[in-house]
UniProtKB/Swiss-Prot annotation:
InterPro entries, per the entry: Fmt, Formyl_trans_C, Formyl_trans_C_sf, Formyl_transf_N, Formyl_transf_N_sf, Formyl_transferase-like_C_sf, GART_AS, Met-tRNA-FMT_C
Protein name: Methionyl-tRNA formyltransferase
Entries under HAMAP family matching the protein: Formyl_trans (MF_00182)
Family according to the record: Belongs to the Fmt family.
Keywords assigned by UniProt, alphabetized: Protein biosynthesis, Transferase
Organism field: Haemophilus influenzae (strain PittGG)
Binding site for (6S)-5,6,7,8-tetrahydrofolate: 112-115
Superkingdom field: Bacteria
Single GO MF annotation: methionyl-tRNA formyltransferase activity
Length: 318
């Protein structure tokens, strides 16, 4: 088994976990590419990405170009003479000159079973859509978005209580071992490249804060999936009014679907220790864990202890 000289390109914690797995393997990371430092926190101080922090701890050269389209950046990368480039949630488009620079091309770790969800948010969209199974795909990159030949797929179930946080952690563990397996066998015939069927693909669009607002004209089953898909970001929310008529926005962390009641969508049906029940166009959404502004997430019962007037039975929420 040959040790490979690898360029690693990635930015968030999900990527850093893959970098650590390669560092723990027999392969050599000769350079790391990551997004430029970005302002973060209240002081808006420049903050290095998790991948950069890990690279610096291991004395690996770090490159942070704003783009890889310029010839200078491409020449710099090519001069590294890498065997392969591993790309995990990097955040920059790789032009053909970069894809062709490493001897064995560029590999990408994708957080779903392709071609089902191509794009930026495959983990979240798989929950949002009600998929019961997902996984990770290691693919050979080409010039289009998530369309390259698939080398290795590893499957896992999506549990009925799965959030994007829990699924992300599960997939990270699967993906790191799958990646090392591919790298260890890249120059033998263990993994045969498989073409994608583009007709089976969907675009996993980025989540937005606007989309996280609970829309009572949607079925309760869809809203419950949204709550899990949008955790840890942007967190599903809705608004009600206090006794003075002031709008109060609440984030929702946990809910369950109950049988349909014949009331207009958005009607508060009950509010007690068992939850806050809201009628939807199809089914009832029972809110179990919520977070008012400036407070920590709490049970519906704890929320009602001081704010019962926010949830008058029969009130119709917008």
């Amino acid at each position: 088994m040959k040790s490979l000289n690898i360029i690693f390109a990635g930015t968030p914690d999900f990527a850093a976990q893959h970098l650590q797995a390669i560092l723990n393997s027999q392969h050599n990371v000769i350079a790391v590419y990551t997004q430029p430092d970005k302002p973060a926190g209240r002081g808006k101080k420049l903050q290095a990405s998790p991948v950069k922090q890990l690279a610096e701890q291991n004395n690996i050269p770090v490159y942070q170009p704003k783009s890889l389209r310029k010839e200078e950046a491409q020449s710099e990368l090519k001069a590294l003479n890498a065997d392969v480039m591993v790309v995990v949630a990097y955040g920059l488009i790789l032009p053909k000159a970069v894809l062709d620079a490493p001897r064995l091309g560029c590999l990408n770790v994708h957080g779903s079973i392709l071609p089902r969800w191509r794009g930026a948010a495959p983990i979240q969209r798989s929950i949002w859509a009600g998929d019961v199974q997902t996984g990770v795909t290691i693919m050979q990159m080409d010039e289009s978005l998530d369309t390259g030949d698939m080398l290795h797929k590893v499957y896992c179930d999506i549990l009925p209580t799965e959030t994007s946080t829990s699924l992300y952690n599960k997939l990270a563990e699967l993906a790191t071992s799958a990646l090392i397996d591919v790298l260890d066998n890249l120059e033998n015939s263990k993994f045969i490249a498989e073409k994608q069927d583009g007709s089976q693909s969907n675009y996993a669009e980025k989540l937005s804060k606007e989309e996280a607002q609970l829309d009572w004209s949607l079925p309760a089953m869809q809203l419950e999936r949204n709550i899990r898909a949008f955790n840890p970001w942007p967190i599903a929310y809705f608004s009600t009014e206090d006794k003075d008529g002031n709008a109060q926005t609440l984030k929702v962390y946990q809910a369950e679907v109950l049988p349909h009641q014949d009331k207009p969508a958005g009607t508060i049906l009950s509010a007690d220790k068992n939850g806050i029940q809201i009628a939807t166009v199809d089914g009832v959404l029972n809110l179990l864990q919520l977070q008012p502004a400036g407070k920590k997430p709490m049970s519906a019962q704890d929320l009602l202890n001081g704010r019962a007037e926010w949830f008058t039975i029969g009130k119709v929420l917008a």
